């Protein structure tokens, strides 16, 4: 079972992963932004920062940065996209149970976010800019979740498990906290860390990043594609309805968790 093949189990490895990941993600958008501003100035334009970020080149450059991160992490074997402890015959079943796990997680998390008011520094306008166009949609819904799983559950969790093989839960908690912090938004820090616990446990239990990637992609895709009308339905639900739906969702969640726990009990 391995989530990463080249780590030596050192803190310096984790720092290197974070630095490389950050540089790869930031470099293409920064370079493109500079080029856009230079071209604009040469033509006598006066584009402000908002206008620069609204150009179609920016979402494409962010997608490029995320793809570069995936390529580098896989090329360097800092993270491994293998089956781990999952048998080939069980792949489809595992993926389906990962979807069930996400379904059980999604609504309780949404309701908890409403109960626990944590500041959200990402405005609707900024979210629209990040997810605009086909490139933004693909990046946010699919490519970014894959890159984050390679970083946090592959490289970082893989390193931490080598550093503390007898304390996997400590490794899972630390990787979850890092996952929350890198989002740089209070609400995503808090709930991202909780989400990271679930994804970290899933990766550790199965020895594979594939189930956590399925859950992560399902989550981001749902957030991206859920119509505003559906969100209003959730917001306007009565307390009794919320409690009942949350209860049913938790039953689904724990059923999926129990399935994974029994299926991959012995490590």
Where are these regions (language model features)?
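C-terminal membrane module of polytopic membrane proteins
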Residues: 217-267
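Hydrophobic residues within alpha-helical transmembrane segments
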Residues: 23, 143, 174-178, 214, ...
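Membrane-interface helix/loop boundary segments of multi-pass membrane proteins
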Residues: 147-174, 201-208
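Juxtamembrane helix-loop-helix connectors linking adjacent transmembrane helices
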Residues: 39-53, 79-147, 158, 162, ...
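Alpha-helical transmembrane segments
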Residues: 13-29, 93-104
């Amino acid at each position: 079972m391995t989530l990463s093949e080249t780590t030596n189990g050192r803190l310096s490895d984790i720092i290197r992963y974070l630095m490389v990941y950050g540089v790869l993600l930031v470099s293409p958008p920064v370079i493109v932004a500079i080029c856009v501003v230079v071209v604009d100035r040469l033509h006598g334009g006066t584009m402000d920062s908002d206008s620069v970020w609204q150009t179609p080149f920016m979402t494409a450059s962010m997608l490029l940065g995320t793809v570069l991160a995936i390529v580098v992490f896989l090329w360097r074997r800092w993270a491994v996209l293998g089956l781990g402890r999952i048998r080939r015959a069980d792949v489809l079943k595992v993926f389906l149970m990962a979807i069930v796990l996400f379904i059980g997680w999604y609504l309780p998390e949404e309701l908890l976010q409403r109960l626990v008011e944590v500041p959200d520094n990402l405005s609707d306008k900024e979210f629209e800019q990040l997810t605009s166009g086909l490139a933004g949609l693909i990046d946010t819904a699919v490519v970014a979740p894959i890159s984050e799983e390679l970083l946090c559950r592959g490289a970082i969790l893989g390193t931490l498990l080598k550093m503390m093989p007898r304390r996997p839960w400590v490794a899972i908690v630390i990787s979850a906290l890092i996952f929350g912090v890198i989002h740089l938004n209070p609400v995503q820090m808090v709930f991202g860390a909780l989400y990271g616990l679930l994804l970290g446990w899933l990766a550790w239990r199965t020895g594979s990043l594939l189930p956590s990637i399925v859950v992560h992609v399902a989550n981001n895709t749902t957030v991206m594609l859920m119509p505003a009308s559906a969100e209003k339905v959730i917001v306007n639900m009565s307390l009794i309805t919320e409690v009942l739906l949350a209860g049913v969702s938790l039953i689904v969640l724990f059923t999926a968790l129990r399935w994974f726990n029994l299926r991959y009990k012995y490590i």
